[in-house]
């Protein structure tokens, strides 16, 4: 029995007409010999309007009740989805999270899945029904309704696929994952296959496509994901284990992030505990720090730079200025006009010269690098915001559009 | 522990402002020393718009999916209700039908309650929470969502009250049950106490107030019901066991029904099986027959009259004409312009002369009686539709407004 979990996002089920389109895609999978298990989000806009309603009642609605309220959106969608399949002549049965059951911990509004019962799903499939499961919802061991956090339907789909040992199809409103944001780089290409790790590092590209937590989940259980457009028959992007990505190009994609602010604490005494003091204070204030760069020290002093999300910048500035004074740093410099450009690819692990090549491309285009940070499969450079698009286009042209040429060089380098 | 089940109908929870009003009524009960258990309907209009949506998808949506869809309305309402209580400082917890659980049979869209778990409710109450239960919903032993049919929230409330051995308060948009329709009889009075039997016979008055099935349920388990307006502090009408209705007046209320059509099958051969043939055919066509009147026969022939709902009249006419021809009746006469006037009261059981007095009042007002039918606590007369309002007013004036005088007569009659 070849089960296929097919997930449809909020835009895909946004109207009754669109639900019918989705249902037809399910029927197509059935005709190809798959046993489909549908996972549906709430119809586009429903969740937002429920949240708005709750906020009118209570500035901070109890999270338990919030979950009960929000679960309504998916319940409505699955009933309509199942009705549509029935109308088209295919017996279908909707299941809420508690009916599957999808058992979670009891952290309301951002619960984690603990286990999934599959016997009911399997017997429905054997009896010839198409199960239509509510995304986003779960139930605790104590019969409390929980939800999995924004975009949680992706996690539902991946978890079901893991439990059923099936592939997972994510039907959404974009055709797949691209090598760069097509609005910036018109030549951006759809990626055919990408590893979980690459997908995670390409978060800023991928987040528009699917919830990052669900990719982590897929990586953990080796669930193969096919992200594709609900509104087209084209193949999308497969997100798969690393060993399945045959073509290990050095650079899979290029991202740009202009939502960060850089701070530099100038002339910090270079002694143990200083970094800890700064970042502990930021952590206590629930500020997420992204890049952290510290150079070698000169004469017992160093400069320390880091970036935070722009929305946290004012709070961060206040905190850091206080600490800077306390530890005797010279000053704190704030720079809001920065962009973080990253290149990502598992090929990097075994390819020499990728970083140097990146710096060279930026230099040739007259772009100064303000900070560098690297991981195994990602290199990020902080640059002046006004060069962001230019940088992405230049990097895309040389790393991706001239890929064949690069791969030869890469091959040579590997010798 | 003095538990009080407080049910709020759709209009009562129709807006967030109204939900707050309802929540305040719950808090008032709490302050009076009650432990309230709230039952809420869906916000006014929700259920209808969900049905409309389903009809757009499927001309006859599968009933199982219909239940899953409709259950959404109450789930939304209870979450908002519980949030409101929390905002006002009173910890509350919403419970869907399956969370209570309210176990039903598996007849989707009109399920019957089989049993109710009360341990979760009791421990919530003991921990200081106000449980807010979704009306209208249940769950089968197989974890299928069911609904109890239109107005099913009343049944939920009465069943919970029965299980918890509590009184049941029905908060609605009318102040109680009246002796007649106040639009016809401006002097109609609110009834203070009425027996289950009277309430059932006054269906046409009572149906605007609460679901008839829930009254049957209350009668079976002796649940005392207090029907009152959500928007007023006044006492409403208590629906109670017969032995609690101290004041056994002959006539508790007067109803009029103009939604029926009368048929008379003229000169029917008076032999066994004829009546059965007519009414079996109507039953097979799912036509509900109300009054049936047959007089003594003359020379082997009799006339047989019955009434059906106007919406079924055309279908009934076709069926009856066929059978009339077959059994050799003379003709079938149809009369659409009839009204059924009924007087109801448990006092009738022990009071002589009530029927005669009713006929006399009608005669004095020049109203001809076309058919009569009686039960232990109800007398119905079919009259010309144009006299309907006149008849109700005249009967109300003499039986209800002049009640004291009547009771003296009644007392005399009983000697």
Swiss-Prot record, chains A, B:
Look up the EC number in the record and give it. Answer: 2.7.2.4
Pfam families linked? AA_kinase, ACT, ACT_9
Record's keyword annotation contains Nucleotide-binding: yes
Domain ACT, first and last residues per copy = 263-337, 343-415
* Molecular function in Gene Ontology: aspartate kinase activity; ATP binding
**What keywords are assigned to this protein?**
Amino-acid biosynthesis, ATP-binding, Diaminopimelate biosynthesis, Kinase, Lysine biosynthesis, Nucleotide-binding, Repeat, Transferase
Catalytic reactions on record: L-aspartate + ATP = 4-phospho-L-aspartate + ADP
Q: Which GO terms describe its cellular component?
A: cytosol
Q: What's the superkingdom here?
A: Bacteria
Pathway assignment reads: Amino-acid biosynthesis; L-lysine biosynthesis via DAP pathway; (S)-tetrahydrodipicolinate from L-aspartate: step 1/4; Amino-acid biosynthesis; L-methionine biosynthesis via de novo pathway; L-homoserine from L-aspartate: step 1/3; Amino-acid biosynthesis; L-threonine biosynthesis; L-threonine from L-aspartate: step 1/5
The coiled-coil segments of this chain are none
Q: Which GO terms describe its biological process?
A: diaminopimelate biosynthetic process; homoserine biosynthetic process; lysine biosynthetic process via diaminopimelate; threonine biosynthetic process
Give the family this protein belongs to, as stated in its UniProt record: Belongs to the aspartokinase family.
* Name of the protein this chain belongs to: Aspartokinase
Species annotation: Aquifex aeolicus (strain VF5)
Q: What is the lineage of its organism?
A: Bacteria, Pseudomonadati, Aquificota, Aquificia, Aquificales
Q: Which gene encodes it?
A: lysC
